[in-house]
Design a protein with these regions (language model features):
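Intrinsically disordered, low-complexity segments enriched in serine/proline and basic residues
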Residues: 1-10, 14
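Short, Lys/Arg-enriched N-terminal segments with co-localized hydrophobic residues
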Residues: 11-27
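Transmembrane alpha-helices and adjacent helix-loop boundaries
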Residues: 24-261
């Protein structure tokens, strides 16, 4: 009796397996095979031959490029925005010339692709890919930061500056102590969005052989014949952007609390 029941169970199991196979249902064996292949591919593109070190080096290059370019962009942006602000009401030839030069800079940089600017910086101005990247990304970001800051300054009520001057403050002190602190609160979201965009724009640094995160991931993809490194790079970029967004929201909350306080 037991033998007959066991044989019947085997027949039912085989019939169910054939039915699942015919209907396209995944089997446990296929699941474990797929999982094993996935883990094997992950090992091949991360641990094998210490490739995780290459990801870290590429990540370090990406962060360094973005951080240095961000500093250059902020310096250029503040300078250009202040020049355009002060030169707007001046009638002298010198101020008009400087204002026109700043306007041309913003128009040209914003109107041409970053890849073209990067190639020009590498082939004409610099011999090293790192220096060319920092310069190109910084100059590119400066044009956008300048417009963001200029818009923030313009959003402040002119009466604020007049009140500062009525208190005996110089034009520079009024800008530094009254206008700019209020403008920063208004432009903070747009400024952080520009920094996030700058971080992602560094992914084209590989055009001039800079081994950033994207370039390293693509190199490993070519060696391992596997597209997983590109997904790993995408996940790392996503984590960086999420982190920057969290910092932005925290700063906005603190500024809001200081306003209420």
């Amino acid at each position: 009796m037991r033998t007959a029941r066991a044989a019947r169970a085997v027949q039912l199991s085989g019939a169910c397996g054939r039915a699942n196979k015919e209907r396209g249902y995944p089997s446990v064996e296929n699941f474990w095979n797929d999982l094993n292949k996935l883990l094997s591919d992950f090992y091949k593109v991360t641990v094998y031959k210490g490739r995780w070190v290459q990801y870290l080096e590429g990540l370090g290059m990406t962060i360094a490029l973005a951080a240095l370019a961000c500093q250059i962009g902020v310096c250029i942006g503040v300078l250009v925005a202040l020049v355009k602000y002060y030169a707007g009401g001046k009638k002298s030839f010198g101020w008009k010339t400087v204002n026109a030069a700043c306007g041309i800079y913003v128009t040209v940089i914003r109107g041409t692709p970053i890849v073209v600017q990067l190639l020009i910086a590498y082939t004409i101005l610099f011999n090293g890919s790192f220096e060319a990247c920092v310069f190109a990304f910084g100059v590119n970001s400066g044009a956008y930061v300048a417009e963001i800051i200029r818009g923030g300054i313009a959003s402040i009520d002119p009466g604020q500056a007049e009140a500062g001057r009525s208190l005996g403050l110089s034009e520079g002190a009024t800008m530094r102590l009254i206008v700019l602190p209020q403008a920063v609160k208004n432009i903070l979201p747009a400024l952080f969005n520009e920094f996030i965009a700058l971080l992602k724009e560094t992914s084209v640094a590989g055009y001039i052989a800079a081994r950033d995160l994207t370039k390293v991931s693509d190199s490993i993809r070519g060696i391992a014949f596997n597209s997983a490194p590109l997904f790993i790079a995408a996940a790392i970029y996503l984590l960086l952007v999420v982190g920057m967004t969290a910092i932005q929201k925290k700063m906005e909350r603190r500024l809001a609390q200081s306003d209420r306080g």
